[in-house]
């Protein structure tokens, strides 16, 4: 149930100028939007309960680095994406995570390295859990945007080859 969940409900959003997407990400907004529409339809036809490309990757990385309970990745990574082309041709993209289970004190957050990571993010003070949730959501947004752009630009496999992952 994505309406009555535990944890934090968080949304991250961005509007990327068409020029930036084309020059930096090698992917025009229209092409990424079209891919997103295909992906959404595929998820719907497969009976998926979410439509993110890989929320779990960013969430897992942040959870391990910042002392979160990694067992909560499964529940936390069920989320939604939304995209549109703005009237001036820019790309609007958002991610919604309805049940992000995070904390900034207790448990693994007290481990030295994990606490240092939270400190670097400015999330060790009491009451900073909402800020941390926003940072995690921004990480997810960037990951999904990067993956989608790399696939559309036909650079996903070549980047893995270049960086040695497929050796």
What role is predicted for each listed range?
Residues 92-167:
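Internal helix-turn-beta structural module
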């Amino acid at each position: 149930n994505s309406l009555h969940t535990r944890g934090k409900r968080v949304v991250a959003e961005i509007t990327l100028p068409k020029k930036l997407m084309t020059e930096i990400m090698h992917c025009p907004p229209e092409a990424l939007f079209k891919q997103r529409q295909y992906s959404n339809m595929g998820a719907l036809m497969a009976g998926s309960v979410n439509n993110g490309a890989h929320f779990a990757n960013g969430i897992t990385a942040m959870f391990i680095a910042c002392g979160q309970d990694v067992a909560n990745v499964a529940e936390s990574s069920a989320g939604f994406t939304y995209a549109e082309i703005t009237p001036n041709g820019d790309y609007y993209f958002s991610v919604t995570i309805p049940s992000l289970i995070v904390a900034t004190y207790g448990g693994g957050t007290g481990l030295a390295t994990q606490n240092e990571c939270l400190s670097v993010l400015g999330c060790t003070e009491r009451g900073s859990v909402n800020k941390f949730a926003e940072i995690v959501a921004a990480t997810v947004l960037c990951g999904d945007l990067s993956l989608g752009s790399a696939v559309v630009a036909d650079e996903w496999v070549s980047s893995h080859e270049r960086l040695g992952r497929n050796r």
